[in-house]
Amino acid sequence: MKINRRDFFRLGAGATAATVLAPYHFALADDGFLEIRAVKAAQSLYPDSPTSTLWTYNGTAPGPEIRVKQGERVRVRFINELEEPSSIHWHGIRIDNAMDGVPGLTQEAVRPGERFEYDFVVPDAGTYWYHAHNKSWNQVGRGLYGPLIVEEPYPAFDAEHDMTLVIDDWLLNQNGQFDEGSMGMMMDWSHGGRLGNWITVNGISHPELTLKAGEAYRLRLINVCNARTLELDPNRFDAKILAFDGQPLPAPITMPYEPYLLSSAQRVDLLVIPKLGQDFALEELSGNSPFPFLTFHVTETGSGSAMVPKLKPNPLAEPDLAKATVHPLLITGGAMGRFDGITFEGKPLGRESMMQSRQFWAFNGVANLPEQQFFTAKRGETVIIEMVNDTAWPHAMHVHGHHFRIEEREGSTIDEGCPWKDTFLIGPSQTTKIAFVADNPGKWLLHCHMLEHAAAGMTTWFEVV
């Protein structure tokens, strides 16, 4: 079937057949390790279209849902059957540094045909995910990601009322297939990142789910898009927020503004108690008209509970702002930005060398992972990073190994209670201060999670000793 690319965001529920979310499957080896294989697999991304060749974990994109309880040990044997070296990063987990999965900083990339064993304990309950962390712009963009759900010791919601929703956007060609030839476009690296023209949920095009009226559901939304910030409005179906980036709020809240911006790599847990006869949809709102990408049908009143269990806070150390050390981070570069004074691999970047190296962005004048750390903090020290975005583009900033609070943000309000996050969106020409206790020893990455931006220079690191 031939589809005009301009039609993708005009097509709504009528363009797809009703379906349910596919179950997740994974294989445990005899020694108790969960085996995750990076392999190519055929998968259909658009209704009635030919399959696309994706890079997957265990044959599907997203890969298997890993679901464990807080405090449990996770053991994963990663086997790389692709032609590129790879690794797995466990996004949002306050993990032992050696298990963080960052080539060049915490481990060597796993070469084709080789394997690596990850072994760690999950300290925090919540919604997390795992993904490739070598050439992420290419590997995540082709499908190397999956959900990691850490349940409370006594799960707040049973399996029927706890739904994981992995949201991705794909750039499809006119045949409805993944557009491989568009990967690595220089404009994506220097502008807003790679944006797709079709949305899937758990790898499925416009799924439809059934809920029972009057029962409480937890919807775990995970944005795995390379660069797209999803514009959502939970208030359209009376949803409340339970958690940001895996960290629960003291009580569910109603968003005081719309749209809610869910940037690349961020997660949000929604509380929904559907009403009889009131079907609703998750919609992306950035276009001229809402684009529904997941529909919920509400059936007869159920016999389950509408009671909302209280989610206990995770054991995060509170920043001591009075004793904090402040570290300025100036973000420069990108299209319509300034490039003066940027260095890459110790040499000044001119226009020609910038185009050849594809390094368009910089932190404090340095493009890409530098030899010298951004800062060193003593274990237990409170750190404030003051980020100044002197570019024309927003950025989804992610801190590895820690969660932080946004303490100050120029030009916009801070969410009530300064909720914990591991990724935040900083707007053009905006200054934002984040604070956290550097209590996890090791070398930790700080980067933009708009993956083309990270590849094009927006990566640095700090050390906790």
How would you describe each model-predicted region?
Residues 1, 7-27:
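N-terminal export signals
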Residues 236-248, 390-419, 451-455, 463-465:
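Active/binding-pocket-proximal capping segment
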